[in-house]
């Protein structure tokens, strides 16, 4: 109902506005502004001016223009005469006529319009009529003429007319100025009202804008504060634990604590952390007192140390969470799984990549973040089907059965795959090689922060038929893998280290760390007792110790997280690969003197470690750095990632072992590396040589024939067990931690071998000599440790396992025509080979170095 009324009232409003404005505009146009200036003279001759402003109306009988002139009063009767003989005034005057009442006008007389015309004819610039007594004169003037006058005709009445007549009657001299618009005022160009109105409007607009901006900023600030509070609530807090008090159990309770191995003081208040004090761990892994950093985070939203924005990472991970539900756990593992190579302290092992999951992150001693990873083992293949990574897409899954591996130790040995034929562990710059791996590695796995090793790359699939798979036969036992519950992929093996078990109450990590959490960082050797300085009896017990420094049990976990403090041969000037760390093998000698194999050290239980019969101490090596035939040392070449010290000069021979050495394309064997101590059990009646003899020269069985150019061969006993003298090789099963090298090639960064040189004609005498040491012999590395050497060694070699016989088999490594024999021409040293008195099989050797530039 209201809407029609409004629509009907709008035309009326507009009509009223037009009616109000139109007369105003017409009146504004017809208004005549008369300014009268009076001149008064003083006795001294000065003149004073007085200005009087009056208003009148322009009539239609004249023009609407401006006029100015001296005021001349004219009597109305004087304009009634049409006589032209009257005196005429000069042009430029303004005539003022006061009209009388109509009854008083003489007749005949001119009309009002005729009087105006008569005044203009006599020279008036304008005519002003006072119509106060004769209102009908206005109608006469507004009737208009066909030919209006060219000068203005103005009529006045009321107070303005009275003022004008007073000035004319009393003053002798006055001047009038008629304008059709009001005269300009000094304040015309500055109107305070308009200015105030404009100022108020602008001020209101600015105030509204400021209020709007302020409200927007406040809303944004409140939103940021809310986000900061939410991020702070989701941020993890941990309680500080002093060194040695960090729980070792693989539960979520252990993840809520921080050890003192990293920075132990707050960067804000510079106070030391107290045991049990609550710390705030920022997603950038920096930690501070909760009371110190929370106000800063709420106000600035950034880390005080690295300016990391916590709001941007609010949707990221917020600390470890224990997932009890199996489905959630499987989904989380699929999203966070990382396939990484694994590094085990102790000795070299090769296995495929293992899936691991980030558990928590802490800071290392140098400010680098170290992530604790959890190893994934597919214990429930039915619930969690394995997903093949991209680089493992073409590899066949292998089902393993640990029960058929023939292992004899009492450790838990997870199933471990053997690589198929053709799947080699290849290098980036050199040709590949194949390895056949055992399955013995410890339950506690230490994953290192460095994921790739220098010079190594992932394998490439090679099309090899199933008939080309390497045969592993030992003493009639075929170590085949049967089907089991655990499914592992078998890509090319990856370098790993592990710590061997210990049999004497030293806290081996297998017994104390049953959880799956592993630490990233350098865990050098993980020993718990230093047996390097013990007697020969204690040195026979299995442990993995560094020759420079040891760790206690309380520092084992911190060592795994923040790096080993017993860095093997670590120095700022050393030139080794920092990403590949190897400790000594279980067969490393521990004492200062090398006990014989038949000594007290060899009479321990089956778990004891038996040393070689004699070890030669070299002048240029540390007294505690002794090598055995199964020792693994750190690589000192910056270009290498693997280093194998294959053989050591020994004083024993190989009794009851038929030696078959082939030059050229013959089958080669190499003594297996000794792994865990369980594989070193000796059985009575198994005589074998304890040390590997490495010779440079022609085949001892071919001394009568023409000698080839400086070939390198090694005579070892097949699958050597540490046995007492006089026993024979006879363990029915193959050691699980031995590995074989298939299609091996010689590389200058792969092997550092201590050798002996002997003349061909002195081979028989050298074989017969049974000397405990070689005073004149010096250890000569075959390949100089030249970091800048990039050329690959084109040694032709083929290592494989084949059945030589039911009772005995040998292993020969042959390298023909390669730079691995290049130092022979430089040294030309004569060294004798040692042998066992009364040996059934005598090894002779010649040293025929090849002369090369």
Swiss-Prot record:
EC number: 2.3.2.27
Membrane topology: Single-pass type I membrane protein
Biased composition (Gly residues): 589-607
SUPFAM superfamilies the record matches: RING/U-box (SSF57850)
UniProt-listed Pfam families: zf-RING_2 (PF13639), ZNRF_3_ecto (PF18212)
Zinc finger (RING-type): 266-307
Extracellular side, ranges: 29-192
Signal peptide annotation: 1-28
Function in brief: E3 ubiquitin-protein ligase that acts as a negative regulator of the Wnt signaling pathway by mediating the ubiquitination and subsequent degradation of Wnt receptor complex components. Along with RSPO2 and RNF43, constitutes a master switch that governs limb specification.
Protein name as annotated: E3 ubiquitin-protein ligase ZNRF3
Gene: znrf3
